[in-house]
């Protein structure tokens, strides 16, 4: 583009050097000198403008809140417009579909799945590990169904699932749960950075871990100060690596177990007999080991609740939600359960390299050990490199989700108002700075207490998932009860959870049992001879007293002692999308007719995908 500097005072463009070739040599030199000065001046001006734009990007974004009638032109005929409070979006949504698809598959695959389950395998054994993950996987699916129904019904609700409990349970319950969820994301950054330093020690344990922490810390902060586009591109690359690693690990583990690779020949179920399927000598001890693994499993499944957010991005959530829920089953079965089974068959629970085993090298991931202890040379280094990428990826996600969650809390009045600052590039700047400051905790990696800090942070994150998932399923139950009390038909719902209210009832009941079991495990920790240990209790149950402090603190400060919002007073139409039952039945019949006319291959794809 031509700037004003390319034109004279008359507005005409300056004569080019070629057009003045008939002038004298000296005149030509004078022109070239003048031209060079102009070029330098333009470059300097361009640099100044770039610096000025970068500085201006940190100024507060402009936005307003209005009441509008929202009608999505991309939705089907059966979706009516809804009247809602909307605000001009300050947080820029610059991610493309390829980013969203890959994130739905890979986001959350990090410390919980790749590293923390080493302690679960060591303390519980392979059978206890698999049982724990299977039990939690059922709750995960029930939570996804409940969140899906609510997200389709309330697609424009501010804060999404974080607002459900405030509306359908009580404000104090919602305040405590969402702040604990915020604490989870704040702890994820230092937790993942510590894990990254532990992962690198597989190669070199002589260099100060804080050096690695500093490198990753600066790298991540640098990404997020350049906005959401930089985050989207880096996450796309990270998640591609994670998915490829999981696929390769599954194939390699089967080959190793069958004797096709490594030095040990056919392994089969050898480690289920020696050292055994369960760790522990008594039945009560083995049961306690399973209880210990449950919280680790919740920590590993962390992030699955973000499924509800993806529903909001779809043009027709009524169609996309069943598909997304079906695909979540594959993620649960393949990425979580299948890999746990393969680890249980290929890694003995008494290996001294597992975290918590007390050996000299207690930092190796079971994914690495599944190959390295059988004599496979190069592959363990590749797996460890991808695990390193994975934990950095989750730390990257925490710097994306954490500041936006804090900003959302400030906008709802649940956090100090100054934290709602969003700059012109869509960065929640002050909230981002808070998260970055919290990440400094990671520099304890050079301390001998590194693994203890890791356990504390993981305990907060694990139990916070319990609270968040319980709030989603309990809100779903309260929503259904309010529909019944207010005489509303379920036919008005665009998507009904396939597990109904019974899935949510089971999920809430099971989570309550997990809270009780975790209390027992925390009070009388494993390997302590059944004796009580106060330090272990707070180390493993810290999230519960934090939640209670927020819950009763909100009650006292606001003088709001409501335990449950009255069912007949709940506003079911706030940000709700209304569906016409007759049009939904008509659309379902049309879809069935299309399915009958499909080829066999298309029918198979429709059934499975």
From Swiss-Prot:
GO molecular function terms noted in the UniProt entry: amino acid transmembrane transporter activity; L-phenylalanine transmembrane transporter activity
Membrane-spanning parts: 100-120, 124-144, 174-194, 211-231, 236-256, 290-310, 329-349, 375-395, 428-448, 452-472, 501-521, 537-557
Role this protein plays: Permease for leucine, valine and isoleucine. Also transports cysteine, methionine, phenyalanine, tyrosine and tryptophan.
Gene Ontology biological-process annotations: amino acid transmembrane transport; amino acid transport; L-leucine import across plasma membrane; transmembrane transport
Phosphothreonine: modified positions: 15
One Gene Ontology CC term in the entry: endoplasmic reticulum
Coiled coil regions, renumbered to chain: none
Regions of compositional bias (Polar residues) in chain numbering: 17-44
InterPro entries: AA-permease/SLC12A_dom (IPR004841), Amino_acid_permease_CS (IPR004840), Amino_acid_permease_fungi (IPR004762), APC_YAT (IPR050524)
Pfam families, sorted: AA_permease
Name of the protein in its database record: Leu/Val/Ile amino-acid permease
Extra remark: Present with 8660 molecules/cell in log phase SD medium.
Residue numbers carrying Phosphoserine: 3, 16, 19, 21, 24, 76, 84
Subcellular localization: Cell membrane
Record keywords: Amino-acid transport, Cell membrane, Membrane, Phosphoprotein, Transmembrane, Transmembrane helix, Transport
Region of interest (Disordered), ranges: 1-48
Extracellular face of the membrane: 121-123, 195-210, 257-289, 350-374, 449-451, 522-536
Species whose genome carries this gene: Saccharomyces cerevisiae (strain ATCC 204508 / S288c) (Baker's yeast)
Family indicated by similarity: Belongs to the amino acid-polyamine-organocation (APC) superfamily. YAT (TC 2.A.3.10) family.
Gene: BAP2
Cytoplasmic domain ranges by topology: 1-99, 145-173, 232-235, 311-328, 396-427, 473-500, 558-609
Membrane topology field: Multi-pass membrane protein
Keyword Repeat: no
């Amino acid at each position: 583009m031509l700037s004003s500097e390319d034109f004279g005072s008359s507005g005409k463009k300056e004569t080019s050097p070629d057009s003045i070739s008939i002038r004298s040599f000296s005149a030509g030199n004078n022109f070239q000198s003048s031209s060079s000065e102009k070029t330098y001046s333009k470059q300097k001006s361009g640099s100044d403008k770039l610096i000025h734009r970068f500085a201006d990007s940190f100024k507060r974004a402009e936005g307003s809140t209005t009441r509008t009638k929202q009608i999505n032109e991309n939705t089907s005929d059966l979706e009516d417009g809804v009247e809602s409070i909307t605000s001009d979006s300050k947080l820029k949504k610059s991610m493309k579909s390829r980013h969203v698809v890959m994130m739905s598959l890979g986001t959350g695959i990090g410390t919980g799945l790749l590293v923390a389950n080493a302690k679960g395998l060591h303390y519980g054994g392979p059978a206890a590990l698999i049982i724990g993950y299977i039990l939690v996987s059922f709750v995960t699916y029930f939570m996804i169904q409940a969140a899906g129904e609510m997200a389709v019904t309330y697609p424009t609700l501010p804060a999404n699932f974080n607002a459900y409990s405030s509306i359908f349970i009580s404000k104090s319950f919602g305040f405590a749960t969402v702040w604990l969820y915020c604490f989870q994301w704040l702890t994820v950054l230092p937790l993942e950075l510590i894990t990254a330093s532990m992962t690198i020690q597989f190669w070199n344990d002589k260099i100060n871990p804080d050096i690695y922490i500093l490198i990753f810390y600066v790298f991540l902060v640098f990404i997020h100060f350049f906005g959401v586009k930089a985050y989207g591109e880096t996450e796309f690359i990270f998640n591609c690596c994670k998915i490829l690693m999981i696929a390769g690990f599954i194939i390699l583990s089967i080959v190793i177990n069958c004797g096709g690779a490594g030095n040990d020949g056919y392994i089969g179920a050898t480690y289920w007999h020696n050292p055994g399927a369960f760790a522990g000598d008594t039945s009560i001890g083995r049961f306690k080991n399973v209880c210990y693994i449950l919280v680790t499993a919740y920590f590993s499944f962390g992030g699955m609740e973000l499924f509800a957010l993806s529903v909001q991005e779809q043009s027709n959530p009524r169609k996309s939600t069943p598909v997304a829920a079906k695909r979540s089953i594959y993620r649960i079965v393949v990425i979580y359960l299948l890999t746990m089974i393969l680890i249980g068959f290929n890694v003995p629970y008494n290996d001294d390299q597992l975290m918590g085993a007390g050996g000299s090298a207690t930092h190796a991931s079971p994914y690495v050990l599944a190959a390295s202890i059988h004599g496979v040379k190069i592959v363990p280094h590749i797996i460890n490199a991808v695990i390193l990428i994975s934990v950095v990826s989750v730390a990257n996600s925490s710097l994306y989700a954490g500041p936006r969650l804090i900003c959302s809390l400030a906008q709802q009045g649940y956090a100090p108002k100054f934290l709602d600052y969003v700059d012109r590039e869509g960065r929640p700047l002050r909230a981002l700075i808070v998260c970055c400051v919290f990440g400094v905790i990671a520099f304890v990696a050079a301390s001998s207490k590194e693994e203890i800090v890791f356990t504390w942070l993981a305990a907060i994150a694990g139990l916070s998932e319990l609270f968040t998932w319980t709030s989603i399923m309990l809100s779903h139950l309260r929503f259904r009860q309010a529909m019944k009390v207010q005489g509303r038909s379920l036919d008005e719902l665009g998507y009904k959870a396939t597990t109904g209210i019974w899935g949510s009832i089971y999920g809430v009941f099971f989570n309550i049992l997990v809270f009780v079991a975790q209390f027992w495990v925390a009070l009388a920790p494993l390997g302590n001879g059944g004796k009580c240990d106060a330090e272990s209790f707070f180390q493993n149950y810290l999230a519960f007293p934090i939640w209670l402090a927020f819950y009763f603190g909100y009650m006292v400060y606001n003088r709001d002692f409501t335990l449950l919002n009255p069912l007949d007073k709940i506003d079911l139409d706030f940000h709700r999308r209304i569906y016409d039952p007759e049009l939904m039945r008509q659309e379902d019949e049309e879809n069935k007719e299309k399915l009958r006319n499909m080829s066999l291959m298309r029918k198979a794809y429709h059934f499975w995908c």
